[in-house]
Every structure is written in C-alpha cells, then in structure tokens.
Amino acid sequence: MPKMKTHRGSAKRFKKTGSGKLKRSHAYTSHLFANKSQKQKRKLRKSAVVSAGDFKRIKQQLANIK
C-alpha cells in the first residue's frame, strides 16, 4: 500500500487549529468590492471554520498535516 500524500492545494488553503478544527478563508475577497457593503467586506476579512460535512472529506486530503 503506498503512502498517503497530502493534497498540496488543500494544505495551502486550510490550517489546523489547536482543538483540531480546520480554519479557512472566505471566498469573494479578490475583487469587485465596490458592489459590496462595508459590513460584508468586514465579515469577509475574518477566517471561518470548516463545516462538519466538509471536514471529513478535507481531513483525508490533509493526511499528514499535524
């Protein structure tokens, strides 16, 4: 059985927290800010936690991330 390899794209997008959850950044933050309200832009700056349904799938891609 070959070794599990870490999906490098996922490794760059997700970070593990101290409690074992996965942090991610929000989408819609690269351009077109004139159409977004100040409140929306402020909320997009903060990081978010990966939902439970996605966590199982992403955890397999991040096999060797401590």
UniProtKB/Swiss-Prot annotation:
Residues 1-48 are annotated as: Disordered. The keyword Manganese does not apply. One of its GO terms (cellular component) is cytosolic large ribosomal subunit. It comes from Bacillus licheniformis (strain ATCC 14580 / DSM 13 / JCM 2505 / CCUG 7422 / NBRC 12200 / NCIMB 9375 / NCTC 10341 / NRRL NRS-1264 / Gibson 46). The gene is rpmI. Belongs to the bacterial ribosomal protein bL35 family. GO terms for molecular function: structural constituent of ribosome. NCBIfam families: rpmI_bact. This is Large ribosomal subunit protein bL35. Coiled coil: none annotated. InterPro entries: Ribosomal_bL35 (IPR001706), Ribosomal_bL35-like (IPR021137), Ribosomal_bL35_CS (IPR018265), Ribosomal_bL35_sf (IPR037229). GO terms for biological process: translation. Keywords: Ribonucleoprotein, Ribosomal protein. Residues 1-26 have a biased composition (Basic residues).
